[in-house]
Amino acid sequence: MKRLFSKSLCTSAAGANLKPPPADSAAIAKLILSSPNTTHQDDQFLLSTKTTPWTPNLVNSVLKRLWNHGPKALQFFHFLDNHHREYVHDASSFDLAIDIAARLHLHPTVWSLIHRMRSLRIGPSPKTFAIVAERYASAGKPDKAVKLFLNMHEHGCFQDLASFNTILDVLCKSKRVEKAYELFRALRGRFSVDTVTYNVILNGWCLIKRTPKALEVLKEMVERGINPNLTTYNTMLKGFFRAGQIRHAWEFFLEMKKRDCEIDVVTYTTVVHGFGVAGEIKRARNVFDEMIREGVLPSVATYNAMIQVLCKKDNVENAVVMFEEMVRRGYEPNVTTYNVLIRGLFHAGEFSRGEELMQRMENEGCEPNFQTYNMMIRYYSECSEVEKALGLFEKMGSGDCLPNLDTYNILISGMFVRKRSEDMVVAGKLLLEMVERGFIPRKFTFNRVLNGLLLTGNQAFAKEILRLQSKSGSRLLRKFRL
């Protein structure tokens, strides 16, 4: 485990011989993540990036790569302000930083960034408020999200139909549909609501499986002279399947065809996936074949739905056949396609075939993502293939897909499968590296690693972990440095 506890990518203590990294977001992100939270490393990073030609595109790319490393991303954002004063962040970079801060529940930071945008006369925009509202709603604070929308004008940003539709969508997607419907009824007279508005509300009711309410919205829509579109009908169809109302879904699909609705690939994919989830594989395949007969070309999403259905029903061999059929017909599998099939192969115990498929994936230029790595690491760990799990972890660290919080948690849990002393030491090192990179371990994780070290005779290392826990406190978001 060469990478664990790597204190720096730099070999010179003074940093005099450092060469600036290329203007490449992957290299910069790795440099940031390799740097412990010390003043000395601030200086090292400054020297390393002194001649980097910063642009909004480069900064945004780095922020996106650090998305799962929120504290480090914010350090980087503020670092440019403090040490590269010739560069000024644009609105898109502020929006990304605000989203990261809001996701970490750092609300004072969020509002500090918003006020800064105003002082620079680059915002905030409706998109900025949509970002913050979404984070409020997902954190269980829908009233704050609504208040934010109603008070947008106080920050120089005025409400319009688009922002109204956005706040409704934010509330609905966070399952606060009652609150969204209440706002819709209160303000629909103020805005000239359209098909998009009704589709948002209808989708909200479908998301929480209240299809009778969704049908009421559809009926009201027609009565008010607002024409439903194909998105409306596809949303309703998906809602029936989501609610497990297979018969209603099929009848609705037949009614769509009877009324000469322009059935598209999304419609067919919805039906294929819906039948598959319900375990009706034969009907799913029949609909898939029907769409081809009707001249509606399947999409990659359609094939993904069929492959997922077959894998979930322990028909992984048929899923492989479907995958090869997809490739033979000229479709290019995406990361979801590969992830679904790799998961199916691993679930069936076909580890070597899953590994071969991952290699094929990379050879075809499709980069594995967090889901790919984390899923494979989990399966390896559960089957005591700890060395293979650690090998994938090292591969993540040397590539563009850097380990995230889930990766560390999965791997630390995996170290407890064999209950070996050396595995407990690795778990401790992972925990230390995790904290060093700005992640926030749960108290349970600290205690589990402590107990594991103590029970396997690693008392000295356990004391080091205990000191770290005491120093860190319940949250590790006190003061971060790059």
Curated annotation (Swiss-Prot):
Regions that span the bilayer: none
Subcellular location, principal: mitochondrion
Any one Gene Ontology BP term: RNA splicing
SUPFAM superfamilies given in the database record: HCP-like
Any matching Pfam family: PPR
Domain of life: Eukaryota
A GO CC annotation given for this chain: mitochondrion
Localization of this protein: Mitochondrion
PPR repeat locations: 90-124, 125-159, 160-190, 194-228, 229-263, 264-298, 299-333, 334-368, 369-403, 404-441, 442-476
Record's keyword terms, sorted: Mitochondrion, Repeat, Transit peptide
Disulfide bonds: none
UniProt KW Transit peptide keyword: yes
Role, per record: Required for the trans-splicing of intron 1 of the mitochondrial nad1 transcript encoding the ND1 subunit of the mitochondrial membrane respiratory chain NADH dehydrogenase (Complex I).
Protein family per UniProt: Belongs to the PPR family. P subfamily.
Protein name: Pentatricopeptide repeat-containing protein At1g74900, mitochondrial
